[in-house]
Amino acid sequence: MILATLCYIKHNGCTLMVHRNKKANDIHEGKWNGLGGKFEPGETPEECIIREAYEESGLILYSPKLCGLLMFPNFKGNDWYVFVFTAMEFTGELIDSPEGTLEWIPDENMLDLNLWQSDHIFMPWIGEGKFFSAKFEYEGDTMRGYDVVFHS
């Protein structure tokens, strides 16, 4: 199982997204994603997302908020468990990201991007403030179904 984080950094009605267009053999090639990545040994989810956001964007996050958990069984040959965060407080200047092109996307345009099918489903839950635990099943690049539990 691969443990990872994902964060949607918010500022002035926009969300920082990365267009994954720089790395060879990237499973997310051509897609738009929030920032995040895999845990390093001994990290908490919060430590992981703060480190990943800094490495990918140059921004230092303060008090990222855990808003959901995602499970992707057998996605590209691995089971992925992803801690989803939002962040409103940060400092720093954007860098030339090694992951792709960074862009502040107006929130109303987020679902118009080339996203994974699952993102179209769970991203509105984030905006509604619903804490969720969801499993999304893919066959190749096609989502086959999902289950979700909401927590109050």
Give residue spans per PLM region.
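Conserved N-terminal beta-strand and adjoining loop/helix that marks the start
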Residues: 1-17, 38
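Short, charged/polar surface micro-motifs in flexible loops or helix N-caps
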Residues: 10-14, 23, 88-93, 129
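N-terminal first-folded block
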Residues: 15-19, 23-41, 49-50
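Unchanged
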Residues: 39-62, 72-125, 146-152
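Catalytic phosphate/metal-binding cores of nucleic-acid and nucleotide-processing enzymes, i.e., regions
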Residues: 68
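Charged phosphate-binding loop/patch that engages nucleotide di/tri-phosphates or the phosphate backbone
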Residues: 127-152
